[in-house]
């Protein structure tokens, strides 16, 4: 990512956020303020996909180059922000995801944490359970809990939907 590019951090929440999330945003703001554009936030409940669409619409009203969608119960250390920004490229890698885990029922007493990175398979998208830590690699799909997207991708999606 070009050093002059600005990143807007966007999140959806019901009116409150996790303390760890808030603290990680404070740390980012204190140490990387020159990289950050305006924060975008959608407050409310309901269908999360609709909230994320409203978030994208709000982001596209800013002048920022990148949107970093964050789940409001996640934490983003400054070092992880730096890795995402370093890996991103507006043409070669316009979408970069940080690794986030979700919990799924497995029939065991406790939910199984599953990485929200996926490979396409005949039976559908399957979670990738084996990956090199601290590396950048291509996936077929990723969750939106920590997703960095270049403006051009979102503009193209908007324009093609109209």
Model-derived features with residue positions:
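Residue-level marker for beta-strand->alpha-helix junctions and adjacent short loops that shape enzyme
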Residues: 14-16, 74, 101-103
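Active-site nucleotide-sugar/metal-binding loop of Leloir-type enzymes
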Residues: 53-66
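Local beta-strand N-terminus motif with an aromatic residue
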Residues: 7, 64, 92-93
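Conserved catalytic core of nucleotide-sugar-dependent glycosyltransferases
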Residues: 56, 77-162
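N-proximal low-complexity "stem/linker" segments adjacent to membrane-targeting elements
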Residues: 1-46, 50
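Short beta-strand-to-loop acidic/aromatic patch adjacent to the donor-nucleotide binding site
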Residues: 64-75
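Polar low-complexity intrinsically disordered regions
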Residues: 11-12, 45, 73, 82-87
């Amino acid at each position: 990512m070009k050093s002059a590019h600005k990143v807007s951090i966007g999140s959806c929440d019901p009116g409150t956020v996790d303390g760890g999330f808030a603290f990680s945003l404070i740390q980012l703001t204190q140490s990387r303020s020159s990289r950050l554009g305006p924060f975008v936030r959608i407050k409310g409940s309901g269908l999360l996909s609709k909230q994320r669409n409203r978030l994208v619409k709000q982001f596209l009203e800013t002048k920022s180059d990148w949107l970093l969608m964050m789940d409001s119960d996640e934490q983003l250390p400054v070092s992880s922000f730096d890795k995402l920004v370093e890996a991103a490229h507006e043409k070669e890698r316009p979408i970069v995801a940080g690794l986030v885990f979700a919990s799924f029922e497995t029939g065991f007493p406790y939910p199984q944490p599953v990485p929200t990175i996926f490979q396409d398979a005949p039976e559908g998208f399957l979670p990738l359970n084996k990956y090199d830590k601290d590396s950048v690699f291509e996936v077929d799909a990723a969750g939106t809990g920590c997703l960095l997207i270049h403006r051009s991708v979102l503009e193209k999606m908007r324009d093609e939907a109209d």
